[in-house]
């Protein structure tokens, strides 16, 4: 799958993309929002393994700028019955430029057209304001809030978002 917009090139992830994925992972782990997610691997073997796992999911897409042909992030989906749960991560150099919105909007339309998807879900920390705003701009609404923890030392309020196009 390949999609070009006026600013972006979006395609399926390949196993050979692991070095660029490693750069995205390292950048994410430095982010102030990393505490709201599981840490991403940074060792080559672990990055290769996770990249392969993502490739095998078949709903994992990478985003490149057209002008620099540089991978700037990814958008992925996990199918759960009739719902598609969305995840995304962009390198911090590309935040606040509309790339997350543009790529996610195009990929939601792609899943609607090619997979018959009409219900999308997402989870994010309520304190991750940029992520919450992105989801709301895409038409998602927060349907519930719950306490989330990925370890015994830290918990936070997570919002469960939904976009229902039925």
Task: Tell what function each PLM region has.
Residues 50-62:
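A short helix-loop-beta-strand connector motif used in the catalytic cores of GNAT acetyltransferases and
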């Amino acid at each position: 799958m390949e999609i070009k917009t006026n600013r972006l090139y979006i395609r399926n992830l390949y196993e050979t993309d692991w070095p660029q994925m490693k750069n995205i992972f390292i950048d994410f782990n430095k982010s102030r929002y990393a505490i709201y997610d599981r840490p991403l691997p940074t060792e080559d073997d672990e990055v290769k393994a996770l990249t392969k796992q993502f490739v095998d999911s078949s709903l994992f897409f990478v985003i490149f700028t057209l002008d620099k042909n540089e991978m700037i992030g990814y958008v992925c989906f996990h199918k759960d019955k009739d719902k598609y749960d969305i995840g995304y991560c962009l390198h911090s150099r590309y935040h606040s430029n509309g790339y997350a919105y543009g790529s996610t909007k195009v990929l939601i339309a792609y899943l609607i057209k090619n997979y018959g998807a009409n219900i999308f879900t997402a989870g994010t920390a309520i304190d991750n304001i940029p992520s919450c705003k992105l989801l709301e701009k895409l038409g998602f609404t927060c349907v519930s809030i719950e306490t989330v923890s990925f370890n015994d030392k830290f918990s936070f309020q997570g919002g469960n978002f939904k976009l229902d196009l039925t």
